[in-house]
Regions:
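Active-site mouth loops of central-metabolism enzymes
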Residues: 60-73, 96, 122-135, 204-208
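Histidine/acidic residue-rich metal-binding segments in metalloenzymes
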Residues: 134-303
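C-terminal cap of metal-dependent C-N hydrolases
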Residues: 318-321, 375-430
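A glycine-rich helix N-cap at a beta->alpha junction
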Residues: 112-126
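Divalent metal-coordination and catalytic microenvironments
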Residues: 9, 24, 29, 50, ...
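Metal-associated gating/positioning segment near the N- to mid-region
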Residues: 48-115
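His/Asp/Glu-enriched, well-ordered alpha-helical/loop segment
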Residues: 200-228, 275, 296-297, 301-302, ...
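Histidine-rich, glycine-flanked metal-binding segment
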Residues: 1-56
Length: 430
């Protein structure tokens, strides 16, 4: 393997608190050195001057649809979309067909990922069998097989009794349960945030209290069991405060937020364009302000995409009948740089920490740092690259993004996985 020398970029490594202009030398798949005026005979030189060199981005909440719905996305297409967006590690949710609820499936999917993906894919196992909320899945066996966390994402079916049993079982393993926080009984058939906007559009709403109730319940159960609850795609101001208060009293609770929940409100909903239909739904400016404050003060630990591609014919249905979600891996960094970093709302260093070191630390991944000896997963960002989102250039099989046509500023221009360049200037190279 040829050595790679990244010269003269601004190196941001939250794990070591490094934020300075430096060189990064990659040899034999690891970070060999970080410092000034590095040299290596025969190394490939990449001029990173004016760019930002960071640990490879990590996304702990994606839906790659494999097995069972490969027409929407599979490990090959999804991993290429991830690499194009600057990601070197992602975790994929278990709501597939069949549901990932056995050790055998975890093992087979890990093997499949090694064969088909251009970056690292980690597997999240289901909490309950077939995600039906009735009987615990093979949790211990899936831990042994390598499941990185557990989730019935997309469902809020487990009763308090079943969920408490899962917390009790997983607490000794220090594995998180990632919960989709909406009380199903309150959001059935709802397609957007409940409020004045939904009433004006004539679209049945999903009340925000459904999220608040769910977050409160799951925090209390995790606190009782001494277990780790991870609140998925938080979107409510009250939920942010509940997490903040729980952390203050020592509860093992972490949480995530998506770029769309940080930058879009219910006012973006257009009944003729289902790309904005997501669960939980887009909320209000008040909620965005609370989430941004939570991101700044550490209440919200990480940013994820909830990358959820669907077939075009599915998303072209009437708003209330279209499935929820859209692809986000190729637009996330640009949206966050444009809307938060370049507007002065969020320091770049904080954003990088929430997209690299934090998820690696919380989910115990050997990733998220540029320390010497670490796996050479590196992303180079051009903070001033101005580009227009074009679905025809997506690597994902889903094209239904609300950001299509948007001009963004900031983009990953180089993605390195285990020392190999897998993306350069938007082109997958392997």
């Amino acid at each position: 393997m040829r050595a790679l020398l990244l010269k003269g970029g601004r190196v941001i490594d939250p794990a070591s608190k490094r934020n300075e202009v430096a060189d990064v030398l990659v040899e034999d798949g690891v970070i060999r050195a970080v410092g000034a005026n590095l040299a290596a005979d025969g190394a490939e030189i990449y001029d990173a001057a004016g760019k930002v060199v960071v640990p490879g981005l990590i996304d702990m909440h994606t839906h790659f649809r494999e097995p069972g719905q490969e027409a929407k996305e599979d490990f090959a297409s999804g991993s290429r979309a991830a690499a194009a967006g600057g990601y070197t590690t992602i975790a994929t949710m278990p709501n597939t067909r069949p549901v990932v609820d056995t050790a055998a499936l975890v093992t087979s999917l890990q093997k499949r990922a090694e064969e088909a993906a251009v970056m690292h894919i980690r597997i999240i196992g289901a909490v309950t069998k077939n995600q039906e909320g009735k009987e615990l899945a093979e949790l211990g066996d899936m831990v042994e097989a390598g499941a990185v966390a557990f989730s019935d994402d997309g469902h809020f079916d487990p009763s308090a009794k079943v969920l408490l049993s899962a917390y009790d079982y997983l607490a000794p393993f220090d594995k998180a349960i990632i919960n989709h926080e909406e009380d199903t009984s309150l959001v059935e058939e709802g397609a957007m945030n409940e409020g004045h906007r939904s009433a004006m559009l004539g679209i049945k709403g999903r009340p925000i209290v459904a999220e608040d109730i769910a977050v409160a319940r799951d925090i209390m159960l995790a606190e009782y069991a001494g277990a780790h609850v991870h609140v998925a795609h938080i979107s409510s101001a009250r939920a942010v405060q509940l997490v903040r208060e729980a952390k203050a009293r020592g509860v093992h609770v972490t949480t995530e937020v998506t770029p769309h929940h940080l930058t879009m409100t219910e006012d973006c909903v257009d009944p003729t364009d289902s790309s904005t239909k997501v669960n939980p739904p887009l909320r209000t400016e008040k909620d965005i302000a609370a989430m941004l404050a939570g991101l700044l003060d550490g209440t919200i630990d990480m940013v994820v995409t909830d990358h959820s591609p669907h077939a075009r014919e599915e998303k072209d249905r009437e708003y209330i009948y279209a499935p929820s979600g859209f692809p986000g891996l190729e637009t996330a960094l640009g949206v966050l740089m444009t809307e938060l970093v370049h507007t002065g709302k969020l320091p770049l260093e904080t954003l990088i920490e929430r997209m690299t070191y934090a998820p690696a630390r919380i989910f115990h991944l050997d990733a998220g740092t540029l320390r010497e000896g670490a796996p050479a997963d590196v992303t180079v960002i051009d903070p001033d690259c101005v580009w227009t989102v074009d679905e025809k250039k997506f690597y994902t099989r889903g094209s239904h993004s609300p950001f299509v046509g948007r001009e963004l500023r900031g983009k990953a221009v180089l993605t390195v996985v285990d020392g190999n360049i897998v993306m350069k200037d938007g082109v997958i190279t392997i």
